[in-house]
């Protein structure tokens, strides 16, 4: 995995995925973990989790993202399962840093939300 692969995925996610911008910190964390966990499962050929309505929601977003990743980035089919997990973990970290920790939106942690 290279830094450019992570940059590609981050740019794609920032541009195309609205689930990262939910209104509360816990929503954003839950979506980042849930959707990207399902993306990792799909890209590594594992069966996605679909036992609960929440898992099915994450799966729906992940399916579109995984298909786009395969279509847009030729390197996605050339990296192994370990590299995919490493890449997704790096993407999760960067998203948390960008959309939660570095966010200036004070409503993310407002006590009335």
From Swiss-Prot:
Coiled coil: none annotated. The key enzymatic reactions in nitrogen fixation are catalyzed by the nitrogenase complex, which has 2 components: the iron protein (component 2) and a component 1 which is either a molybdenum-iron protein, a vanadium-iron, or an iron-iron protein. Its EC number is 1.18.6.1. GO terms for biological process: nitrogen fixation. Signal peptide: none annotated. Keywords: ATP-binding, Iron, Iron-sulfur, Metal-binding, Nitrogen fixation, Nucleotide-binding, Oxidoreductase, Vanadium. This is Nitrogenase vanadium-iron protein delta chain. The lineage of its organism: Bacteria, Pseudomonadati, Pseudomonadota, Gammaproteobacteria, Pseudomonadales. It comes from the Bacteria.
